[in-house]
Amino acid sequence: DLHLLSRRQRQMCIRDSVITAEYQEFYLVNVYTPNSQRGLERLDYRQIWEDAFRDYLLKLDQIKPVLVCGDLNVAHREIDLKNWKTNRNNAGFTDEERAKMTELLTAGFTDSFRHLYPEKEGAYTWWSYMFKAREKNAGWRIDYWLVSDRWADRIEDSVIYADITGSDHCPVGLVLK
């Protein structure tokens, strides 16, 4: 359904890892959001990309509910990373990136994990390979399941499988009624 977007938006989405599967009742969108990079070298590009991605999701959502899963490369709230004070204005925790996440949620999507566990601390999906970060659980929650607001009441559980290793990220799961 990339045909719903302009040519430029399609190119941006395709290049930066968006895969969409259509099912009878919903769309499933898997995404890797561009990282702003050290020194925020790609922050401007990311902001444009985020607008295009949000517009794409909203167009899909007009047709049927949307489930979004993937690495959104943003810790939305201070509770979503261990060391938020020292990471302020680093890639993944800038005011701009967090504002774009807020815009996406406000536009009609629910963060499934925070919907069920609004104040749960220590729930992370990514840890640096340095400084024994995983062992110390000094991580970030940057992998999400987002659900169209109209399906928020169908969220039964949103799971972070922190014990599964093999990557600097861990899997996340979603259970719907």
Where are these regions (language model features)?
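A short, charged helix-loop
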Residues: 31, 36-41
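Active-site beta-strand termini and strand-to-loop segments that position acidic
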Residues: 21-24, 148-149, 174-177
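Surface polyanion/phosphate-binding segment centered on an Asp-His-Pro turn
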Residues: 159-177
